[in-house]
Amino acid sequence: MSLSIDVTSLPSISSNIFKNESSSTTSTLSGKSIGRNEQYVSSDIEAFNKYMLSKSPEDIGPSDSASNDPLTSFSIRSNAVKTNADAGVSMDSSTQSRPSSNVGCDQMDFSLTKGINVSASLDSCVSISTNHKKEKSKKDKSRKHYPRIEADSDSEDYVLDDSDSDDGKCKNCKYKKKYFALRMRMKQVAMQLIEDL
């Protein structure tokens, strides 16, 4: 498996900070030649210290740390070097047939040299029972049915309705007849008092 990344026009950090070690290898995959030009960049501790000390604390922000370890962060940032479009790896061309320019640029290439084998097995048993007993809800059990109580009046002008009761709080209760009788009596007493005055 081969991975080719072409990176162009990335900003270059001053070249005296890095120690460059280059190696060129050629490998064969499926009968096709793949040319590789790999650039290994290692950070210089003294140059890193100078770089960090030259910046004011206000200028150091989240972009200056790709890791909690400053030296690792500096090494990660050092990979963002100026590169050439010719650095890409072609499956159909070899190192000799590929044009290259070594002036003013670094060539970067990535190769996957380790294979990762993932084997995962999941044994699970799911049991679904479709037998469902219909149970009465608690609401139905707690509901009690009371007999409806009808109240009648002896007088013809006596009307039992809830329109003038206290917001319908006295609906079909056993004291309804007594309540209306008492209210009618209180009305009569009040009217008699008004007439006497």
Curated annotation (Swiss-Prot):
Superkingdom per UniProt: Viruses
Cellular component terms (Gene Ontology): host cell cytoplasm
Residues binding Mg(2+): D92
UniProt PTM comment: O-glycosylated. Hyperphosphorylated on serine residues, when in dimeric form. Phosphorylation by host CK1 is required for the hyperphosphorylation of NSP5 dimer.
GO terms of biological process kind: viral genome replication
Residue pairs linked by disulfide bridges in the UniProt entry: none
Chief site of localization: host cell
Signal peptide range in chain numbering: none
Biased composition range(s): Basic residues: 131-146
Keywords: Glycoprotein, Host cytoplasm, Magnesium, Metal-binding, Nucleotide-binding, Phosphoprotein, RNA-binding
Pfam family for this entry, one: Rota_NS26
Any one GO MF annotation of this record: magnesium ion binding
In-chain residues carrying the UniProt-annotated modification Phosphoserine: S67, S153, S155, S163, S165
Protein location: Host cytoplasm
Cofactor(s) the record lists: Mg(2+)
Ranges of biased composition (kind: Acidic residues): 152-165
Renumbered residue ranges of the record's region Disordered: 16-36, 130-167
Keyword Phosphoprotein tagged: yes
InterPro entries to which the protein is assigned, alphabetical: Rotavirus_A/C_NSP5
Keyword Transcription (UniProt): no
Entry's family note: Belongs to the rotavirus NSP5 family.
Function per UniProt: Plays an essential role in the viral genome replication. Participates, together with NSP2, in the formation of viral factories (viroplasms), which are large inclusions in the host cytoplasm where replication intermediates are assembled and viral RNA replication takes place. Orchestrates the recruitment of viroplasmic proteins such as capsid proteins to these factories. Participates in the selective exclusion of host proteins from stress granules (SG) and P bodies (PB). Also participates in the sequestration of these remodeled organelles in viral factories.
Complex formation: Homodimer. Interacts with VP1. Interacts with VP2. Interacts with NSP2; this interaction leads to up-regulation of NSP5 hyperphosphorylation and formation of virus factories. Interacts with NSP6. Participates in the selective exclusion of host proteins from stress granules (SG) and P bodies (PB). Also participates in the sequestration of these remodeled organelles in viral factories.
HAMAP family assigned to the protein according to its UniProt record, in alphabetical order: ROTA_NSP5
Protein name as it appears in the record: Non-structural protein 5
Annotated organism of origin: Rotavirus A (strain RVA/Human/United States/M/1976/G3P[X]) (RV-A)
